[in-house]
C-alpha cells in the first residue's frame, strides 16, 4: 500500500516537515501582526488610553474634586473601585474590535491584503484564528496599559483585592471573547458601515456592559438585568470585578466562566464561517 501523499513534499525528506509547515506559517502570520503593532506602538497606546483615561479623569478625579462625585463622598470612593474592572474590560473589547474588525474590513475591502494571507499553507479557518490570537494578545497589552491609569488617576482610594488565579484565567478569556467578536464584526461589515458599527453596536455594548456599575445593582430594573445578559461585555466586566474587587457584588463563578466561554465559542464559529464565506466569494 502506498503512503498517503499528504505526509511529504516532493524534493524534501519525509521528516514531518509538511506537518510542521502550517504551524510555521501560523507563527509567521502572528509575528507579522505583532511586528506591525511594535512599529505602530505609539498609535496603539494613544487609541487604547484616550477613552478610558478621559472617563476615569472626569468621573473619578474631577467630579470628586469639585464635590460632584457619583453618590456623594462615600459614593465617589465606591465608584472608583467599581470603575477599575470596568475600564479594564472596556480596554479589552475596544482593542478586540480595533485590532481585528477594522483591519479585516480594510482587508476585505479596498486593500485586498487578505488574499496574501490565505495563500499561506494553512486552512482558511486557521488564518481567521490567527487574527483572533493576535487581537487577543493586543487586548492583553491594552489591559496592562489601562490598569495603572484606572488605579492611580482617581482622587479617591481604589480598594483592590486581587485574585491572581482568577485574573490569569479570566483576563485572557476576556481578550479572546473580544477578539472573536471583532472577527464576527469584521467579516460582516463593509467600509461604509464602520461609523454605523460604532454607533449602534459598540456604544450600546459599552454602556450596557456592567462596566460602570455591577450587574447585581440592576435588580430594581429586572427587564434590563435580564436583557444585558446577551451582552458579552457584562461577563467580561464581572470577570474583572471578581478578580480585582471581589468585595463588590458580582456574578457567580459559573455564570462568568460559562458566559465568556459560550460567547467565545459562538463568536469564533460565526466569525470563521463569515471569514470563509468572504474569502471564497
Language-model regions, residue ranges each:
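Junction motif at the cytosolic side of a transmembrane helix
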Residues: 2-11, 244-248, 258-281
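Alpha-helical transmembrane segments and their short interhelical loops
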Residues: 124-199, 249-272
Amino acid at each position: 500500500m502506498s503512503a498517503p501523499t499528504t505526509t511529504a513534499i516532493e524534493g524534501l525528506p519525509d521528516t514531518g516537515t509538511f506537518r510542521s509547515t502550517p504551524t510555521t506559517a501560523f507563527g509567521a502570520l502572528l509575528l507579522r501582526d505583532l511586528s506591525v503593532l511594535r512599529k505602530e506602538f505609539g498609535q496603539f497606546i494613544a487609541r487604547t488610553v484616550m477613552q478610558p483615561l478621559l472617563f476615569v479623569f472626569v468621573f473619578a478625579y474631577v467630579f470628586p474634586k469639585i464635590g460632584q462625585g457619583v453618590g456623594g463622598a462615600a459614593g465617589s470612593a465606591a465608584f472608583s473601585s467599581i470603575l477599575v474592572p470596568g475600564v479594564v474590560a472596556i480596554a479589552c473589547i475596544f482593542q478586540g474590535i480595533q485590532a481585528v474588525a477594522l483591519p479585516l474590513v480594510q482587508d476585505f475591502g479596498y486593500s485586498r491584503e487578505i488574499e496574501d494571507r490565505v495563500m499561506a499553507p494553512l486552512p482558511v479557518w486557521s488564518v481567521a484564528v490567527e487574527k483572533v490570537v493576535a487581537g487577543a494578545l493586543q487586548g492583553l497589552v491594552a489591559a496592562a496599559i489601562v490598569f495603572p491609569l484606572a488605579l492611580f488617576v482617581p482622587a479617591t482610594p481604589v480598594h483592590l483585592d486581587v485574585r491572581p488565579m482568577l485574573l490569569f484565567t479570566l483576563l485572557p478569556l476576556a481578550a479572546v471573547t473580544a477578539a472573536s467578536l471583532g472577527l464576527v464584526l469584521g467579516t460582516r461589515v463593509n467600509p461604509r458601515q464602520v461609523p454605523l458599527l460604532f454607533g449602534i453596536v459598540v456604544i450600546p455594548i459599552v454602556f450596557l456592559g456592567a462596566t460602570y456599575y455591577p450587574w447585581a445593582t440592576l435588580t430594581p430594573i429586572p427587564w434590563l438585568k435580564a436583557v444585558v445578559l446577551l451582552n458579552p461585555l457584562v461577563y467580561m466586566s464581572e470577570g474583572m470585578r471578581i478578580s480585582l474587587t471581589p468585595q463588590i457584588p458580582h456574578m457567580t463563578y459559573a455564570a462568568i466562566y460559562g458566559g465568556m466561554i459560550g460567547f467565545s465559542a459562538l463568536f469564533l464559529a460565526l466569525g470563521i464561517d463569515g471569514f470563509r464565506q468572504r474569502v471564497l466569494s
